[in-house]
Amino acid sequence: DCPSDWSPYEGHCYKHFIKWMNNEDAERFC
């Protein structure tokens, strides 16, 4: 299960802000 402010996606958890970021910006947070 993901924390309440994260979203499950393809077996991973993402914070909502990643939805409006492009892939390169999102990868910098990994």
Swiss-Prot record:
Entries under InterPro entries matching the protein: C-type_lectin-like/link_sf, CTDL_fold
Domain C-type lectin: 1-30
GO molecular function terms listed in the Swiss-Prot or TrEMBL record: metal ion binding; toxin activity
Compartment list: Secreted
Keywords from the named record: Blood coagulation cascade inhibiting toxin, Calcium, Disulfide bond, Hemostasis impairing toxin, Metal-binding, Secreted, Toxin
Disulfide bridges in this chain: C2-C13
Tissues in which the UniProt entry reports expression: Expressed by the venom gland.
Major localization class: secreted
Gene Ontology CC entries for this record: extracellular region
Function according to Swiss-Prot or TrEMBL: Anticoagulant protein which binds to the gamma-carboxyglutamic acid-domain regions of factors IX (F9) and factor X (F10) in the presence of calcium with a 1 to 1 stoichiometry.
Assembly description: Heterodimer of subunits A and B; disulfide-linked.
Other observations noted: Calcium is required for ligand binding.
Family: Belongs to the snaclec family.
Protein's UniProt name: Snaclec coagulation factor IX/factor X-binding protein subunit A
